[in-house]
Amino acid sequence: MRVKRGFSAHRRHKKYLEMAKGFRGGRSRLYRTAREAVERSLVYAYIGRKQRKREFRKLWILRINAGAREHGLSYSKMMAGLSQAGIMLNRKILAELAVKQKEDFAKLVEIAKNQVH
């Protein structure tokens, strides 16, 4: 029996057009441009997942540095002091403390200061 490919082609087209929902113009309506746009968007999404980790780490370091400098200590000295004191808090938590719980962060800065000086 002869196999025609209309069903599978239609399903494939539908899959890409579903993924292209919300794109502007022909990118959401025309199969070929929609497929190209979707494939490119998936590449950007993959790259973005890697960049997000780097960006958040940068943001956390920036916030910790700003909080530490308010109390007269640099980021690197603070991290060294906390390490010497045996305080193992990650940058995400430290940044959270620096922004939302300034008193607790100030105590950590004092501990780090005592270790460094």
From Swiss-Prot:
GO BP of this protein: ribosomal large subunit assembly; translation
Classification via CDD domains: Ribosomal_L20
GO molecular function terms listed in the Swiss-Prot or TrEMBL record: rRNA binding; structural constituent of ribosome
Record flagged with keyword RNA-binding: yes
Entry annotated with the keyword Transcription regulation: no
UniProtKB keywords: Ribonucleoprotein, Ribosomal protein, RNA-binding, rRNA-binding
One of the record's GO cellular component terms: ribosome
InterPro entries reported for this sequence: Ribosomal_bL20, RIBOSOMAL_L20_CS, Ribosomal_protein_bL20_C
Chain's role: Binds directly to 23S ribosomal RNA and is necessary for the in vitro assembly process of the 50S ribosomal subunit. It is not involved in the protein synthesizing functions of that subunit.
Family (UniProt): Belongs to the bacterial ribosomal protein bL20 family.
Identification of the protein by name: Large ribosomal subunit protein bL20
Protein source organism: Lawsonia intracellularis (strain PHE/MN1-00)
Lineage of source species: Bacteria, Pseudomonadati, Thermodesulfobacteriota, Desulfovibrionia, Desulfovibrionales
Gene name in the database record: rplT
